[in-house]
Curated annotation (Swiss-Prot):
Belongs to the somatotropin/prolactin family. One of its GO terms (biological process) is female pregnancy. Keywords: Disulfide bond, Glycoprotein, Hormone, Secreted, Signal. It comes from Rattus norvegicus. The gene is Prl6a1. This is Prolactin-6A1.
Length: 234
């Protein structure tokens, strides 16, 4: 009788431990399933005005970071000219941003929706390009570590800005598709070129294009606020 009770007690204890173990596993799975940018989930509670102000701050910050990275790059070019071959003229960038014609008869909100989608698509192009710049530079004989670190940091900032823009798009047109595709930069294909001079020049060209686009992007975020909040162009 006593032995039977002990066996039953041990089985109950084992069952309890198993349940606790399963509960912990499920808890960890739930934690692991939280999106990487879960902090952005709270932006759904922000007002449109608040999201736009946040986007303006982030865009300006990204523009400054890109300008700083470009300065570091040009300094590296100055002291290591044989690495980058900067004497060649720049080729055309992937496309001047925000040049697609939009009907003037559309409402400011419709124009705003179009502009947000364009900006999201453009940022996707930037993140793709920055990733490949950092990746290819890391395989150089003497990797420019500071430039690589800055490129990765800017990539993360851009992802945060994209998150805010998607929040804005959801405010002004809920359920709208977000994938307005931008063509990739032509120079990306040359980052893996067997021609060392061509490959290194591609970096120079990409940095210049990124700098030009970031300055235009900064002003367009401010224009977006004018269209959506004040119903006019500033």
């Amino acid at each position: 009788m006593v032995k039977s009770w002990l066996r039953m007690s041990k089985k109950m204890e084992a069952g309890t431990l198993l349940m606790l173990l399963m509960s912990n596993i499920l808890l960890w799975e739930n934690v692991a399933s939280v999106p990487r940018h879960a902090s952005g989930a709270g932006r759904g509670e922000m007002s449109l005005h608040g999201l736009l102000d946040h986007a303006i701050i982030l865009a300006h910050n990204v523009t400054e970071l890109i300008a700083e990275m470009n300065s570091v790059f040009l300094e590296d070019v100055l002291y290591k000219p044989g690495r980058w071959f900067p004497e060649r003229d720049l080729t055309a960038c992937h496309r001047s941003p925000f040049t697609i014609a939009v009907s003037k008869e559309g409402t400011q909100q419709r124009l705003g929706v179009f502009l947000v989608k364009e900006m999201i698509g453009m940022l996707e192009t930037w993140t793709f390009s920055l990733y490949h710049i950092a990746n290819e530079m890391s395989h150089m004989e003497e990797p420019p570590d500071e430039i690589i670190s800055r490129a990765k940091n800017i990539e993360e900032k851009i992802k945060e800005l994209m998150d805010v823009l998607k929040g804005i798009l959801n405010k002004i047109q809920p359920g709208s598709p977000q994938n307005e595709r931008f063509p990739m930069w032509n120079e990306l294909a040359y980052l893996r070129s067997p021609d060392e001079e061509r490959r290194h020049f591609a970096f120079t060209n990409l940095f210049q294009c990124l700098l030009q686009d970031s300055r235009k992007f900064d002003s367009k975020v401010r224009l977006l606020k004018c269209r959506l909040i004040y119903n006019r162009d500033c």
